[in-house]
Swiss-Prot record:
It comes from Chilobrachys guangxiensis. GO terms for molecular function: ion channel inhibitor activity; potassium channel regulator activity; sodium channel regulator activity; toxin activity. The presence of a 'disulfide through disulfide knot' structurally defines this protein as a knottin. Pfam families: Toxin_12. This is Beta/kappa-theraphotoxin-Cg1a. Belongs to the neurotoxin 10 (Hwtx-1) family. 44 (Jztx-4) subfamily. It comes from the Eukaryota. Residues 1-27 form the signal peptide. Disulfide bonds join 31-46, 38-51, 45-58. Keywords: Disulfide bond, Ion channel impairing toxin, Knottin, Neurotoxin, Potassium channel impairing toxin, Secreted, Signal, Toxin, Voltage-gated potassium channel impairing toxin, Voltage-gated sodium channel impairing toxin. Expressed by the venom gland.
Length: 63
């Protein structure tokens, strides 16, 4: 039962990531949203997001 629950949660997380990637692929690419790969040679992050120097993707700006 415990393994089934963990597998279900991992599957759901994978589904959400794939759905997000499909949505990003359909956008016009002017700016990057959450978890968008950013940095040199890549589109800038959208308003409300900042490029994380540690991870190299767009994250929510700290207040």
């Amino acid at each position: 039962m415990k393994n089934t629950s963990i597998l279900f949660i991992l599957g759901l997380a994978l589904l959400l990531v794939l759905a997000f990637e499909a949505q990003v692929g359909e956008s016009d690419g002017e700016c990057g949203g959450f978890w968008w790969k950013c940095g040199r040679g890549k589109p800038p992050c959208c308003k409300g997001y900042a490029c994380s120097k540690t991870w190299g993707w767009c994250a929510v700006e700290a207040p």
